[in-house]
Amino acid sequence: MGCTMSAEDRAAAERSRDIEKKLKEDGIQAAKDIKLLLLGAGESGKSTIVKQMKIIHEGGFTSEDNKQYKPVVYSNTIQSLVAIVRAMSTLNIPYGDNEREEIKSDAKIVLDVIARMEDTEPFSEELLAAMKRLWTDTGVQECFGRSNEYQLNDSAKYFLDDLDRLGSKDYMPTEQDILRTRVKTTGIVEVHFSFKNLNFKLFDVGGQRSERKKWIHCFEDVTAIIFCVAMSEYDQVLHEDETTNRMQESLKLFDNICNNKWFTDTSIILFLNKKDLFEEKIKKSSLTICFNEYTGNQTYEEAAAYIQAQFEAKNKSSSKEIYCHQTCATDTNNIQFVFDAVTDVIIANNLRGCGLY
């Protein structure tokens, strides 16, 4: 008689099965909702990754988007040239054509545009001619070659090498132009998209020190963190503190994130970004500027492996794996390939976390 189930027991068992089924369904749904946090110091390429998600997963930029980026391209280009011109006096670099008064007049034309706050306007013929003469001046080129000694946008050469196209009357930004633009992220940018039957919410938060206090409320229920590091910034200092090396700042920030109690069970993906710029820079600027104990060769492979090891060494948890990728955020194919691999890791880890893998 002890083997028979009462109606009440049967109902309880059925309720239990229903609850388990519902929990499993909820778990599967939870595993499909992916919350990604993009973290990293300022100018590490986070906002470019967000733009790539728009290109790869949301059909790219509309003609309206393109129009809105026009003034940003103009401003980035002029501001870059002005940064070089101003650095020439700081670094005591003379113009190559120093005897010619015209070159100093050209510099004044460009500086006056900034003073009048007209840097978002299309280039006048006079301004375009002045910018072209300045950019080809040997002194300006020498100063550009020392850009690690002052603050200059990574996109400076990209835009200044293409002044004729940017200065044409029918100019409209290309996808690559938009990827190269730089606008400081303030606050939090949120992007939603679907991929591999998953619903992604990607959060890009400002990387400058003043912006980091805004991160905290994004921390809850994060599936994974993508931490961006600009490999090419090993010989540069911060905008906000010119006594601090940018890569050392990134290492300190990564240490804080990687070992933070909020992220004990959070997947951490490390993007060693700007590999294209790093590959060029490492040929002429020593890694010992940042890591004075480095004794390896000045080759991309050895130097990149050393940088990766420095970041991985910050991980104090034997059970936490850091998933590392070397990236070029302005290369859509590279980011598409890397994000595909990242998504597979997220799927496996998320299902495991829900007890479904």
Curated annotation (Swiss-Prot):
UniProt GO BP: adenylate cyclase-modulating G protein-coupled receptor signaling pathway
Give me the Gene Ontology terms describing cellular component: cytoplasm; heterotrimeric G-protein complex
Q: Does the keyword Repeat apply?
A: no
* Chain intervals for the UniProt region annotation (G5 motif): 327-332
Keywords recorded for this protein, A-Z = GTP-binding, Lipoprotein, Magnesium, Metal-binding, Myristate, Nucleotide-binding, Palmitate, Transducer
Renumbered residue ranges of the record's region G2 motif: 177-185
Q: Where is this region: G1 motif?
A: 35-48
Q: Could you say which residues bind Mg(2+) here?
A: 47, 185
Q: Which residues form the G-alpha domain?
A: 32-357
Source taxon at top rank = Eukaryota
InterPro entries associated with the record: Gprotein_alpha_I, Gprotein_alpha_su, GproteinA_insert, P-loop_NTPase
The answer to whether the entry has keyword Nucleotide-binding is yes
Q: Where does the chain bind GTP? A: 40-47, 179-185, 204-208, 273-276, 329
S-palmitoyl cysteine lipid attachment residues: 3
Region G4 motif, as annotated, extends over 269-276
**A GO molecular-function term, please?**
GTPase activity
Quote the PROSITE patterns the UniProt record gives.
G_ALPHA (PS51882)
Q: Where is this region: G3 motif?
A: 200-209
Q: How does it assemble?
A: G proteins are composed of 3 units; alpha, beta and gamma. The alpha chain contains the guanine nucleotide binding site.
Q: What is the annotated role of this protein in its UniProt record?
A: Guanine nucleotide-binding proteins (G proteins) are involved as modulators or transducers in various transmembrane signaling systems. The G(o) protein function is not clear.
**Protein name, UniProt field:** Guanine nucleotide-binding protein G(o) subunit alpha
Protein's organism: Mizuhopecten yessoensis
Gene behind the chain: SCGOA
